[in-house]
């Protein structure tokens, strides 16, 4: 498939993704609020915001790796791509551990950070831990996603993300009906992220060029460049 066709498919599928997810979200939000109090939903948003702040502990590797991976794939320089991939994986792995540790420390003081009056502390802690694990998995997945984007497979990503959004919505509905409150939102998100991470790994393994996806040697020069 030519680069132009891939680009056009990427644009079209992006619009389809935006339209369908917006429609589903317009239905899902009020549906969720029919099971969860607005104040409890606010707890979920607050906990998600805390995770976002913790994610600032990343080294900012993803943006640089995206451009480097695209450059290497364009030149078919797979030796350099392997160096960038290995170094990025190690750095993202380090970021994942750092985010996990800080997140676990925050969990110990969650009742001091968030006023849990009127809501089960178990629900708050469980939701926070699930969101934390989701964040860690996402960080570790980022270099793999960047390789696929650099290889101009964004149209496939859009289709997969759309399918996973629907799967996440279905799990959310299921968990809400089972009475899991705000835990439903975090659990369904984690399930979707685990699925997309597994699919991303398989797709990268099936690319026409071979990469060692497990962290190999750490290249200091590449680290400085990134």
Kindly give the residue locations of the regions a language model identified.
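Membrane-interface helix-capping segments at transmembrane helix termini in multi-pass transporters
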Residues: 5, 36-44, 76-86, 97-132, ...
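Interhelical loop/hinge segments that connect adjacent transmembrane helices in multipass membrane
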Residues: 1-7, 200-226
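Hydrophobic alpha-helical transmembrane segments
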Residues: 125, 129, 159-207, 225
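Transmembrane-helix boundary and interhelical linker motifs in polytopic inner-membrane proteins
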Residues: 1-5, 37-39, 54-92, 113-116, ...
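Signature of the first transmembrane helix
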Residues: 6-71, 100-104, 134, 169, ...
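Hydrophobic core positions of alpha-helical segments in small-molecule transporters
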Residues: 13, 47, 84-87, 91, ...
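Alpha-helical transmembrane segments of multi-pass membrane proteins
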Residues: 9, 13, 17, 82-98, ...
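Membrane-interface junctions at transmembrane-helix termini in multi-pass inner-membrane proteins
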Residues: 4-11, 133-160, 183
């Amino acid at each position: 498939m030519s680069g132009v066709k891939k680009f056009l498919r990427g644009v079209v599928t992006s619009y389809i993704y935006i339209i369908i997810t917006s429609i589903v979200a317009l239905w899902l939000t009020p549906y969720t609020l029919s099971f969860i109090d607005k104040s409890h939903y606010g707890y979920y948003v607050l906990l998600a915001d805390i995770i976002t702040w913790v994610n600032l502990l990343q080294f900012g590797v993803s943006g640089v790796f995206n451009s480097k991976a695209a450059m290497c794939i364009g030149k078919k320089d797979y030796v350099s791509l392997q160096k960038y991939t290995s170094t990025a994986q190690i750095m993202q792995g380090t970021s994942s551990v750092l985010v996990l540790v800080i997140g676990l420390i925050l969990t110990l003081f969650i009742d001091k950070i968030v006023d849990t009056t009127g809501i089960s502390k178990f629900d708050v802690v469980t939701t926070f831990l699930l969101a934390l694990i989701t964040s860690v998995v996402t960080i570790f997945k980022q270099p793999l996603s960047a390789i696929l984007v650099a290889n101009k497979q964004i149209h496939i990503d859009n289709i997969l993300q759309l399918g996973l959004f629907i799967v996440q919505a279905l799990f959310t509905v299921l968990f809400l009906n089972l009475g899991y409150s705000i835990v439903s939102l975090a659990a369904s998100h984690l399930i979707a992220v685990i699925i997309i991470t597994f699919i991303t790994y398989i797709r990268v393994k099936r690319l026409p060029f071979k990469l060692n996806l497990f962290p190999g040697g750490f290249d200091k020069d590449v680290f400085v460049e990134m």
